[in-house]
């Protein structure tokens, strides 16, 4: 049933091969997504530009992970194991109450999030993201590649990662250029083979960068411009 849900929701044939069969079409050599990226050693600030990402559990030992970040760092990471719709929705509601004005993005791939989405939509705006949907960037294969590209740019710009588990997931994540010239992120199942667990936290973090409008605050943007031209 779970496989059928993904098959029906992922329309891109290449993405379907990646998600269901762990296969990437003819490609060049793999590259770590953090290659040539310098990770910041310290957090450079804080603000109230809060964004939430929710990666939904799909199979077996996968967990639902909720990440909240501001423009500078991760402020919450909540893993939920074998959690039902009510439990997940309740955690989201608590975070909304805590952080007030917050933008929310949820993994809608395969329809696993439908119950949570319906509950949260009663009182709050929530954006469902199908990882296999069309990319906004013409050089990326799909929305998942868009999100990770934006995440890497943020890290290179000083976004602080102080969670070792997320660092491990990031370093285990690579990309390739497909035979049609698109950037594709390695499928979760292949990353899971390296780590021994699914990179759910990193996918939740990447979701917070789905929209470039939620990347950094205006204050942080001005700081980065100052660094570039000093």
Model-derived regions, located:
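A residue-level signal for conserved active-site and pocket-lining positions in enzyme catalytic cores
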Residues: 20, 151, 204
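Conserved hydrophobic/aromatic positions in well-ordered beta-strands
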Residues: 67-69, 205
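ATPase catalytic-site recognition across NTP-hydrolyzing enzymes
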Residues: 1-54, 68, 180
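Acidic two-metal-ion nuclease catalytic site recognized across multiple nuclease folds
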Residues: 33, 78-79, 174-183, 193-230
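Short, flexible loop/turn motifs enriched in small residues
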Residues: 58-65
């Amino acid at each position: 049933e779970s496989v059928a849900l993904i098959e029906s929701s992922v329309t891109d044939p290449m993405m379907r091969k990646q998600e269901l069969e762990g296969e990437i079409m003819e490609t060049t050599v793999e590259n770590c997504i953090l290659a040539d990226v310098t990770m910041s050693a310290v957090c450079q600030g804080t603000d109230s530009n809060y964004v939430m990402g929710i990666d939904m559990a799909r199979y077996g030992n996968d967990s639902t992970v909720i990440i909240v970040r501001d423009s500078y760092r991760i402020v919450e990471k909540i893993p939920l194991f074998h959690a039902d719709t009510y439990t997940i929705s309740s955690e989201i509601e608590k975070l909304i109450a805590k952080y007030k004005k917050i933008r929310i993005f949820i993994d809608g791939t395969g329809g696993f999030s439908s119950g949570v989405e319906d509950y949260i939509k009663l009182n709050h705006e929530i954006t469902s993201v199908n990882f296999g949907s069309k990319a906004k960037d013409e050089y990326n294969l799909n929305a998942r590649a868009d999100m990770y590209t934006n995440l890497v740019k943020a890290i290179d710009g000083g976004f602080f990662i102080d969670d070792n588990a997320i660092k491990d997931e990031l370093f285990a994540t690579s990309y390739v250029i497909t035979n049609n010239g698109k950037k594709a992120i390695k499928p979760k199942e292949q990353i899971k083979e390296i780590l021994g667990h699914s990179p759910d936290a990193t996918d939740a973090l990447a979701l917070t960068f789905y929209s470039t409008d939620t990347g950094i605050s205006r204050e942080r943007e001005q700081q980065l411009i100052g660094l570039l031209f000093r």
